[in-house]
Amino acid sequence: MGKVIGIDLGTTNSCVAVMEGTQPKVIENAEGARTTPSIVAFTDEGERLVGQPAKRQAVTNPSRTFFAIKRLIGRTYDDPMTQKDKGLVPYHIVRAGNGDAWVEADGKQFSPSQISAFTLQKMKETAESYLGQPVTQAVITVPAYFNDAQRQATKDAGKIAGLEVLRIINEPTAAALAYGLDKKKSGVIAVYDLGGGTFDVSILEIGDGVFEVKSTNGDTFLGGEDFDNRIVEYLAAEFKREQGIDLTRDKLALQRLKEAAEKAKIELSSATQTEINLPYITADASGPKHLALKLSRAKFESLVDDLIQRTIEPCRKALKDAGVAASEIDEVVLVGGMTRMPKIQDVVKTFFGKEPHKGVNPDEVVAIGAAVQAGVLQGDVKDVLLLDVTPLSLGIETLGGVFTRLIDRNTTIPTKKSQVFSTAEDNQNAVTIRVFQGEREMAADNKLLGQFDLVGIPPAPRGVPQIEVTFDIDANGIVNVTAKDKATGKEHQIRIQASGGLSDTEIQRMVQEAEANAAEDKKRRELVEVKNQGESLVHATEKSVKEYGDKVSESDRAGISTAIDALRQALAGEDVETIKARTTDLMQASMKLGEAMYAAQAGGGEAASAGAEDPQAKKDDVIDADFQEVDDKDHKKRA
């Protein structure tokens, strides 16, 4: 069995870790960073960029650069949060055939699961490069407050990326695992997790290797992106006030504002003031316009105060559901990049009445916890038991549109619960089971997860047939529902697939596309590598001709010149094999030059002339000299 990796698929950044013996290790990506921006872009040439390369070109390619895609995963196009997001991002959000929110670039539509899969592929490749072996299995984290559709969509993303997702684990729970792994502590901890796009709070009880989640709460549309947007709105408003130009209508300017906002936000965690300078942000008839202003920490805090306060109510609810007071919390663990903001730390300290624990890296702790869970599933980590909960109540719609709960929120999972219902009308031969998730009393106000029909019920007066509805939630928090007519034994079971969501056929198509893209990416990479190699050889050869050209014959110089021209011509094209062949030709042609060069270095100008007359003899001389040098070194070592 290969290694199982742990992946934190974040809104802003993603991170991958693996267990090495009993210790988790965060793996650096190809760029040498421990986290990877969750950004995917498509260039003019159709090339796909993931991570830092995608982020670098975002300003010049805003409509084809997808960021914060996690906010759309598992959401419908008509969802109020999707509509809110539409006004905040420069790329196109479109309605898919199934009613889900998808994104579009150059006329091609992508599901959020597919875009997330590209980031997961990058994480997979990062792990494979480090481990030196293929990786096919992973534990992936999601916000604790993700509903069933969002969890299923995350699992689909893993599948598209070529990963078997062994477990979907809640981010605060993963953080608690990482926090508590080496500690022999026991007690009640609160995990306050404010990331790039989502907020979660979980109350856990830890003791003797058992991590039991008592309650969880949160907001799946509250995070660093919202803090960035407040700065963007402020900058745009100030610029409009001074210059009379609305920058929000210009996608290029908007992307520059977004980058500047993120940078300013980060700087204000350590500095009390930052300067934002964006020259040539736009232009009008009078000429180019520049944006330059100072932003103080106090001003930033006033811009986002309501966002920070929005995290307090979920904390209050989580404590109430867990049946503990703030004073009974032994430790508050901060997770997510936003918790570096001093004001957030102050608010958390005030609410819980204690200094929050800052001993974990907020950007890496979730991936580390995922790796620990991967180690548990693989059998490498012993004596750790994780008991998580379902974040939202589950139930069905009953007469009058009422939401009848079968499983209450914060129930430990996996769990199974049954309840008997009956028909609403005489001689009713079929019932429609509509499954909802949420906390509102009327079904329509909650999230519809899916529906199915149980048919073939024998005619009977209303209230007589007995229909047993069973909810089964697995350890990933994904729901199965069964309806059974107790009189006939007739049964209908579904794994909840939202009215939207990806079908197996669509997932399979996306898997194949991902594989095809991987092959295409490999070809592109090979082309870039052989071109780089060819260009380096041309440069080195031309330099050598200038220095040592007089040491070789006229015909050799002509041969080298012809080979350089042929390689240059090949480099202008896209044919890998032709470039390789012309590179080899130039290497062969320039061998005489190389011999002359070594001869000149080893024996001076006279020897080099001899080398030009008798290259083979000189080659031998060079080799002898080479061995002589080594012998000298050895002799020195012995002495």
From Swiss-Prot:
Protein keywords: ATP-binding, Chaperone, Nucleotide-binding, Phosphoprotein, Stress response
Molecular functions per Gene Ontology: ATP binding; ATP-dependent protein folding chaperone; unfolded protein binding
InterPro entries: ATPase_NBD (IPR043129), Chaperone_DnaK (IPR012725), Heat_shock_70_CS (IPR018181), HSP70_C_sf (IPR029048), HSP70_peptide-bd_sf (IPR029047), Hsp_70_fam (IPR013126)
Inducing factors: By stress conditions e.g. heat shock.
Compositionally biased spans, kind Basic and acidic residues: 630-639
Disordered as annotated region, ranges: 601-639
Transmembrane segments: none
Biased composition (Low complexity): 601-613
Family annotation (Gene3D superfamilies): 1.20.1270.10, 3.30.420.40, Actin, Chain A, domain 4 (3.90.640.10), Substrate Binding Domain Of DNAk, Chain A, domain 1 (2.60.34.10)
Modified residues (Phosphothreonine): 198
Family: Belongs to the heat shock protein 70 family.
General function of this protein: Acts as a chaperone.
Record's protein name: Chaperone protein DnaK
Species assigned in the record: Methylobacterium sp. (strain 4-46)
Taxonomic lineage: Bacteria, Pseudomonadati, Pseudomonadota, Alphaproteobacteria, Hyphomicrobiales
